[in-house]
């Protein structure tokens, strides 16, 4: 019963997200009677990450990575013994450092600043796994992601001991983003219904999270040309699958 409810919740969230991203996506309900719930595997995970920015602009430039964090619920639907459809719901914090002429010429703050974005993400992909040997199995996975941006901020560091509040950047950010992921992982079988897993996953945004028109209209950082900001990350996940 718990697995049935969890499957319904995850599938409903995926359907809502796809409906929001793609206007023509059908919105009919999910018929769980057509799905074999024994083929569903769910998991919970913690995801520390190294994240950075890809910036396209005539002034602003990326300037290094930052340590970030995430967590999530994974959902695998096993097609056969080696192939699964993978999805889930993740909360990610992404971002990195950047600099531009305004930050370089500031006399009160350091030369660069940090941009941070928080998002709810829905991945959808395929997992190809090896047979289990001595309780261990390994896999490759990849696919696409879509997500809603929940928050965005810019953080400058003072050259003195004076604290500088973060700047809310949500109004200058897009409401959603689309990207892709690819990674490797391993499972260790603890019991017949419980596995410990670890993953290394590369993620990159295909769409910019910056609303260029808003940057220019508000004269933010004196930008006169459109800016594109695409977050990326290398994630290191550990979790339990049941």
How would you name each of these model-derived features?
Residues 1-27, 238-242:
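Bacterial Sec-dependent N-terminal signal peptides
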Residues 21, 73, 123-128, 183-185:
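Short, well-ordered amphipathic alpha-helices
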Residues 21-72, 239-241:
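Short glycine/proline- and aromatic-enriched beta-strand/turn motifs that initiate or cap beta-hairpins
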């Amino acid at each position: 019963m718990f697995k049935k409810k969890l499957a319904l919740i995850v599938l409903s969230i995926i359907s809502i997200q796809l409906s929001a991203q793609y206007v023509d996506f059908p919105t009919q309900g999910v018929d769980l009677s057509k799905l074999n719930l024994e083929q569903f595997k769910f998991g919970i995970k913690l995801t520390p990450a190294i994240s950075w920015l890809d910036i396209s602009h005539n002034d602003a430039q990326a300037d290094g990575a930052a340590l970030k964090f995430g967590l999530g619920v994974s959902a695998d639907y096993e097609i056969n013994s080696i192939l699964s459809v993978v999805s889930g719901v993740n909360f990610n914090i992404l971002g990195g450092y950047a600099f531009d002429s305004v930050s370089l010429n500031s006399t009160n703050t350091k030369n660069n600043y940090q941009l941070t974005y928080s998002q709810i993400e829905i991945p959808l992909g395929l997992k190809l796994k090896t047979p289990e040997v001595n309780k261990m199995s390994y896999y490759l996975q990849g696919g696409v992601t879509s997500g809603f941006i929940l928050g965005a901020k810019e953080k400058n560091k003072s050259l003195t001991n004076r604290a500088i509040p973060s700047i809310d950047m949500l109004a200058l950010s897009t409401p959603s983003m689309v990207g892709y992921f690819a990674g490797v992982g391993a499972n260790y079988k603890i019991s017949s219904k419980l596995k410990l897993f670890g993953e290394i996953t590369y993620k990159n945004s295909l769409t910019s999270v910056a609303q260029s028109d808003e940057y220019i209209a508000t004269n933010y950082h004196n930008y006169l040309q459109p800016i594109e900001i695409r977050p990326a990350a290398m994630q290191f996940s550990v979790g339990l699958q049941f």
